């Protein structure tokens, strides 16, 4: 559901175009105007020149990646669920796996960022990177990791999920919201 305070803004438009059926349904519930689904194209040049050394990541380790921006509502992105799932899947602590949590703007959300760091510090295989990367660096990071994880509570579209899948990475994602337009049992879990 979209915020009620957005409803007056909808009056300025003749129609609304939405990047996912999830958003289309949410917007349509708040207006009588036409609301159309227009899928987003995901296309980019394949990044080159990046390796794990560029990001100071371990070699010979299967790396799961989560990418999010603190401005996109920390609780909605649900990074603690990723940490908990990682710990449950690999409880011994000696499996050759790692979880890379790439965030940005943690300094502007210190309470949430500190909670994330506290949870991440419990397992030395979890690496937290809070930095602003150029778009090709984010794609390069996706490329050098082995799988993408998003245990979100809601995604409008799921751009990072789509990008990682286009790079050929397995996606482990919540079966809810905007990403369900393109994440299916035959291409993700």
Model-derived segments and their meaning:
Residues 10, 139-145:
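Short alpha-helical donor nucleotide-sugar binding micro-motif in glycosyltransferases
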Residues 148-149:
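A short hydrophobic beta-strand element within the catalytic core of glycosyltransferases
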Residues 170-173, 183:
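Short hydrophobic beta-strand element within catalytic cores of glycosyltransferases
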Residues 153:
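Aromatic "clamp/platform" in nucleotide-sugar-dependent glycosyltransferases that forms part
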Residues 110-139:
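Nucleotide-activated donor-binding/catalytic signature segment of Leloir-type glycosyltransferases, i.e.
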Residues 14-25, 32-48:
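Donor nucleotide-sugar binding/catalytic pocket of nucleotide-sugar-dependent glycosyltransferases
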Residues 58-77, 83-86, 99-101:
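Conserved donor-binding/catalytic core segment of Leloir-type glycosyltransferases
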Residues 48-64, 91-94:
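Nucleotide-sugar donor-binding and catalytic loop/hinge architecture
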């Amino acid at each position: 559901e979209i915020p009620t305070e957005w409803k007056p803004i909808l009056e300025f438009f003749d129609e609304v175009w939405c990047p996912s059926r999830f958003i289309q349904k949410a917007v349509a519930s708040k207006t009588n105007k036409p609301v159309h689904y227009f899928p987003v194209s995901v296309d980019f040049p394949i990044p080159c020149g990046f390796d794990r050394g560029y990001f100071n990541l371990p070699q010979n380790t299967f790396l799961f990646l989560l990418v999010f921006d603190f401005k996109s509502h920390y609780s909605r992105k649900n990074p603690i669920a990723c940490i908990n799932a990682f710990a449950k899947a690999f409880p011994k602590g000696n499996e050759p796996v790692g979880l890379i949590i790439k965030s940005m703007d943690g300094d502007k959300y210190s309470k949430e960022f500190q909670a994330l760091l506290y949870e991440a510090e419990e397992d030395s295989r979890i690496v937290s990177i809070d930095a602003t990367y150029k778009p090709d660096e984010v794609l390069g990071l996706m490329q050098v990791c082995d799988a993408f994880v998003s245990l979100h509570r809601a995604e409008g579209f799921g751009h990072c999920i789509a990008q990682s899948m286009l790079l050929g990475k397995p996606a482990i994602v919540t079966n809810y919201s905007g990403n369900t337009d393109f994440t299916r049992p035959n291409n993700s879990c």
